[in-house]
Amino acid sequence: MTDISMRFGMQAEAREFLKLAVPLAGAQMAQAATGFVDTVMMGWLGQDVLAAGGLATMIFMAFMMTGVGLISGVSPLVAEAYGAGQTRRIGQLTRQGLWIVLLLSIPGMLFITHLNGVMHWSGQADTTIILSDSYLNVMAWGLFPAIAFATLRGCIIALSQARPIMLIVIAATLFNILGNYGLGFGKWGFPALGITGLAIASISAHWIMFLSLLVYMLWHKPLHQYSLFDSLHHLKPRILQQLLWVGGPIGIAAVLEYGLYLTASFFMGALGTPILAAHQVVSQTVLVLFMVPLAMSYAATVRVGQWFGQQHWPQIRQAALVSIGLAVLFMLTAGIALLAYPQQIIGLYLDLNDPANGEALNVGISIMKIAAFGLVLDGLQRTANGVLQGLQDTRIPMVLGTIAYWGIGLTASYLLGFYTPLSGAGVWIGTYIGLAAASIAYLWRFQKVMVRKKSLPVARS
């Protein structure tokens, strides 16, 4: 184990941070590329498929990220144990995290496959409901491997080993892209399964990622000291409670955050299929860009958590400043690109020469410009929350997120979308108002937590 208790300057902290963040960003971007290709191929299958597939993808992502949030306690707790030299505890945390995954996946699969009533109630078109249902019935089988992979990923990055994640995700992404093309359009001897074929390729990629990382962790000798999978069948209620004590609020916050995006998608669907299609195009583009600050938030959780294990407060503040600053810088650059090339980006998804796509194109351009300004807020709130997770401060941020996302963001989205001429653009503006509130709240909370924890002889949440 490297001596992480040494003093780091800002430049040195940035180097250590980027050693984690760059491979993780590569992995997240590769994974987002899968969603990007899915969306492009859905567009090739028609505007109805694009709208339905986009809505179904948002639903699956909401469930998946809720599960990922609930097991997110693995990463900060393992990072703290790694920083404190508690080798045995690392394996215990990882094993119990996998038990949580199993207990979450079964009810999650049942919910995903029984959402017809919700879609009818929200005013979705019949075609959208039928196509979404066929996609979700397959994607439900990818829920367990997706969350289990996130659990193992949380362990491995907390041990400062991010490169295997990137290689595994890139390989699975290439498989998914080829599978999409073969199964979606009937190439290379496969039947043309349309949107169902895209779902089959996606769940196959989730299983490949999970099993590949599992094999790596079993095979890699430096990891054997942690006994990661010994006595896997033993439930440890005390450790389960610790994981859920930290991860539970993160999971609830994920429900609220992704629930905001999902509800916004329902709002857009109620405004019309072309508007929903435009929303899906911009959402997918933003999601690809969001993968970088998301990776940075994971790295921030690990760096802050490792310093937290050593009780080094100046280094914790440095890690926070580095992660938030780099995330804001990246999203600012990405926002400029969206402002400069909105039509070209939308043209990757939709045929700009098809008159049937005219309304979707016009709405998409207006939304893209709004997203360009909102990206910085998205990156800021995500990395600031990652810093708080590294300090194992998750319950108050959950409350702050509830107020910001639903009390402010959702209300603003509804009012601006349905009671002003802004329509779909208003829904996006309202969402970013919520993210702005979350950003301010999380930064305030970080300052407050730092003052409080530094005054304690042994800081613990």
From Swiss-Prot:
MF annotations from Gene Ontology: antiporter activity; xenobiotic transmembrane transporter activity
Membrane spanning residue stretches: 17-37, 51-71, 98-118, 138-158, 165-185, 198-218, 243-263, 275-295, 320-340, 360-380, 398-418, 424-444
Record's subcellular location: Cell inner membrane
Entry GO CC: plasma membrane
UniProt-listed GO biological process terms: monoatomic ion transport
Main location: membrane
Entries under CDD domains matching the protein: MATE_NorM_like (cd13131)
Domain of life per record: Bacteria
Key words of the record: Antiport, Cell inner membrane, Cell membrane, Ion transport, Membrane, Transmembrane, Transmembrane helix, Transport
Similarity remark: Belongs to the multi antimicrobial extrusion (MATE) (TC 2.A.66.1) family.
Identification of the protein by name: Probable multidrug resistance protein NorM
Gene behind this protein: norM
